[in-house]
Amino acid sequence: MLVYTVGTFDLLHVGHLALLKYCNTLGDVAVGVASDDVVNSYKPNVPIILLEHRIEMLRALSCVSIVRPYYELEYVTACQELDPDIFIIGEDWGKDKHNIDVENYLKSQGKEIIKVSYNPKTSSTKIKQTVISQLEESEHYHEPILQT
């Protein structure tokens, strides 16, 4: 049984790990990792962690069997190549054309699509916001070391 999921996986955290461990309870796990250009097509900022490093970290996880980047915002090609039995999507999965296309393809192939909920306490965005907030607070309370 092959389980496929996709994402950015920037600042790999316990929420990502929970998702991947869940996928692994269903079968062997294949992960599609969005390239910076793909992420930038729907988010204002590119990932902090380089694509190659995100791939390397995911490959190091024992619950992940296959890691492959994707360079276009479409999932049908990867699903045709990998032939997953199950496709895992997040609760923020929208109704954009690329999402509907892969849903239609998978349904036509008799494949299962499972939607999972995210942990509201853990997200890459929240981690980034915390870091920014702490930096701003630090700069507010401390004089810069170097002055011009």
Q: Which positions does each model-derived feature cover?
A:
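Nucleotidyltransferase catalytic core that binds NTPs
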Residues: 1-148
